[in-house]
Amino acid sequence: MKTIICLFTIAIAAMAAVTNLSNVLKNGNDNFTARMFTEVVKNNPGKSIVLSAFSVLPPLAQLALASDGETHEELLKAIGFPDDDAIRTEFASKSRDLRSIKGVELKMANKVYVHDGGKLDENFAVVSRDVFNSDVQNIDFSKNTVAAKSINDWVEENTNNRIKDLVNPDSLSSATAAVLVNAIYFKGAWSSKFDERLTSDRDFYVSKDKTIKVPMMYKRGDYKYGESAVLNAQLIEIPYKGDQSSLIVVLPKDKDGITQLQEALKDPKTLETAQQSMYSTEVDLYLPKFKIETETNLKDVLSNMNVNKIFNNDAQITRLLKGESLSVSEAIQKAFIEINEEGAEAAAANAFTMTRSSKVYVRPPIVFNANKPFYYALQVDGVIMFNGIFIN
């Protein structure tokens, strides 16, 4: 049996909004994000991470439309969609919304690489073009080094050179039928930038009893702020230009509270409920500058999320290529994020391989000092585009 490889890339920096995402897509993304976050954290103990569950959804949705039977039902359940019509409607709308974003650099690109001699199923070709705005290219996978370079060059171009070497040539062979690639890149700026002159090295608690020095940014400003007893944490929302996207930071009250926080975040409604009680107030904000890169083996992660059948030899992916039944042999995500005084920049890439984002106050400002491990999420119009934890 021929195989498919799925690759995911995401690049994001201080973003503006995707509008009118329906509850179906938002709820599906919230649940998928919470589950994927839990698994990626589990696989990276004691490490800072960045991931984008949002970028995994389009390839999985494409595979759902290309599959039958139990594989089809398993994929629909995983991404939280009731049927194929909902996939077509929601992702077509999302693609249009992304292309209409003004004032920031925001790109979302999809591409399907098909083995020489292979041809997309006519219906899948139409859906790929009209729903996912996906390009198609035939390629000789037996020339694995040349094929990998071609795919990696496309990924670099669509993530502003932030994601490199996504595909290992050794993962490609004459048995490779197709490679599904998704890339997202975003770049923007804070609504109100941090002053670089106020950035200084300050203590950061990597554990309850151990500190290191990190470059800590500082700004006094008007932010949405809240506290949650359920999360045992402070929350702050830092807006990007356009005020439709923001960075949410959830800071445990205890120096060693990150594990408890991660456990609470398994329920996506917990964070949503905490955000609903946030209010505007003056805050003294201390936030580390940081840069994180994470590579995730999505085959392991998805399997732990009960997405298994696409990896089996009897995967029933029969509507992607004409006359060929396929399975997924490899699924990889590379992700990148950088937070600094100007804003944020992040990148991620995914690949699936198949075989045949002044007021006067009577009280002093609230202090939000992110000097211990914390959770962050970049939201666009209330939808989590990528998230992670910063530990050191």
From Swiss-Prot:
GO cellular component, one term: extracellular space
Entry GO MF terms: serine-type endopeptidase inhibitor activity
Transmembrane residue ranges: none
Gene3D superfamilies assigned: Alpha-1-antitrypsin, domain 1 (2.30.39.10), Antithrombin, subunit I, domain 2 (3.30.497.10)
Signal peptide per UniProt: 1-16
InterPro entries: Serpin_CS (IPR023795), Serpin_dom (IPR023796), Serpin_fam (IPR000215), Serpin_sf (IPR036186), Serpin_sf_1 (IPR042178), Serpin_sf_2 (IPR042185)
Described purpose of this protein according to its UniProt entry: May play a role in the prophenoloxidase activating system in the silkworm hemolymph.
Protein name per the record: Antitrypsin
Chain coiled-coil ranges: none
Subcellular localization: Secreted
UniProt keywords, alphabetically: Protease inhibitor, Secreted, Serine protease inhibitor, Signal
Keyword set includes Methyltransferase: no
PROSITE patterns: SERPIN
Site residues, Reactive bond: 359-360
Tissue note: Hemolymph.
UniProt family annotation: Belongs to the serpin family.
Domain observations: The reactive center loop (RCL) extends out from the body of the protein and directs binding to the target protease. The protease cleaves the serpin at the reactive site within the RCL, establishing a covalent linkage between the serpin reactive site and the active site of the protease. The resulting inactive serpin-protease complex is highly stable.
